[in-house]
Structures are given as C-alpha cells and as structure tokens.
Design a protein with these regions (language model features):
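Short linear sequence motif anchored by a di-proline
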Residues: 1-235
C-alpha cells in the first residue's frame, strides 16, 4: 500500500513541468509528510477545454453513492487487480482519472522486532506521478461537494520488493495523456523501472504526520538491516 508520501515541488513548478496552462485553484504548501484525508494536489483533464488542470482533492476516495464519508479511510489505495471492477472505483476508472505529483514516498520494511521506514524516490531527484482516480461526493448535511482521490497500487518492481509487497503505480510521461483521457486501460498500470529508483532507511519520525520537515528524509545508519540479503541498495 501507499499511506504516506511527500510533495516538495511547488505548484507553480508542477504546472510548468506537466504542461498545465490553467493556474491551480489553490496553491497548497509543500509537505514532507502527506497523510490520508489531507488535501493534496492532483492533475486532471478537462474534456471541454481539452486542457489539464492542477486541483486540490482530498486523499481518500468517497464514492458518489456513499452514505458515510468515513469510508475514505478505507479507500486511500485502489488495487490495480480490481480497480476496474470494485464498486468503489469502477466508475472513476472509466471516467475520472488523475495524476498525483510526488517527490518521494515512504514504505515500512518488516524486520525482526518491528518495521523500518524507507524513503523511495527517483535517482535523478525529479518529481514523478502516481496513477490515481477521483470522485465527487455531495455532503447531505451541508449540500457541499467534496472532491476526493485514491492512489492505485500494484505489484512492486524488483527494487521496491526488498522493502514492501506493494507499491504505488508510477506512470512514465509517455503514458500521462493516455491515462488522463481514458485512452489506455490497465495495460499501462505496471511496475515502474527499478533501475531508475533509489531508497534509504529513515527515522521513525515519519510515523507521525505532525513531523513535516526536511529532516524526515535524513538517512539513518542501519548496518544490521543493510546486511540482509533482501535489503535494497542504499544510495
């Protein structure tokens, strides 16, 4: 699963990088420790204007038919294996897709006696995007619309497998348009190339979303973990 990530590239730079002509609705501050139910930036496609937009969505998808918004705690991730058939996601998979800009994400490696958090990112330190879905939900108590999203997860590549049994689906740039416009299906939702990624162990401070600062990703020396055969390469 993916339950924590960071977005440290400013919205203005993301708009330039991902060819978004329309200014973001709201310039969310960067965050080193984004957690479920928080507001996040997402890239969507407007079929009328034929343009991309950079919008604010709530992480944790609430289906349009949901009675209780607390379902969002269970829908932060959509499994690629069932994303096109599961009741919570199948309509969004057909009509409401998004890209979620990221600079790195966190996964916890099970070790004897507990778990060790790792930060995972690109070797060239560039931002990248998760494949996501979004939905609109009308709050019956206020009659206000809330737009929410989920991150699609799948099998890990050979690199991330040394840390966790799942990983978010990362889309290469050549697939961005096809995903947003609905021109491609699950065939592009595959593990990202392992040789482009890096990871290292970090402090357990990341466990608390209140800890939101650059020190979150400071490397931690874990010689005993690094000696294990299935440990990822530390870069």
């Amino acid at each position: 699963m993916c339950g924590r990530y960071r977005r440290t590239t400013a919205a203005e730079e993301l708009a330039r990088r991902y060819h978004i002509p329309i200014p973001p609705q709201r310039d969310l501050p960067i965050s080193w420790n984004i957690a479920p139910t928080q507001d996040v930036l997402a890239i969507r496609f407007n079929p009328e204007s034929k343009q991309r937009t950079l919008d604010t969505l709530r992480w944790g998808l609430i289906p349009s038919w949901a009675k209780d918004p607390k379902i969002a705690y269970k829908t932060i991730n959509a499994r690629v294996e069932t994303v096109d058939t599961a009741p919570s996601y199948r309509q969004a998979f057909m009509k409401r897709r998004c890209l979620i800009p990221v600079d790195g994400f966190y996964e916890w490696k099970k070790v004897l006696g507990g778990k060790i958090p790792y930060t995972i990112s690109m070797k060239n330190n560039s931002p990248f995007v998760f494949a996501g879905l979004w939905e609109g939900w009308n709050d019956p108590s206020t009659d206000e619309w809330l737009r929410t999203c989920t991150i699609i997860t799948g099998e890990p590549n050979g690199f991330v497998r040394g840390i966790h049994t799942r990983m978010p689906v990362i889309l290469s740039e050549e697939h961005h348009n096809a995903w947003l416009c609905g021109e491609a299906g699950k065939e592009i939702l595959v593990p990202y190339p392992a040789d482009r990624m890096k990871a290292w162990p970090i402090s357990a401070r990341v466990n608390d979303p209140k800890n939101d600062d650059p020190e979150i990703v400071a490397p931690v020396e874990l010689e005993s973990v690094a000696r294990q055969e299935d440990s990822p390469q530390l870069l």
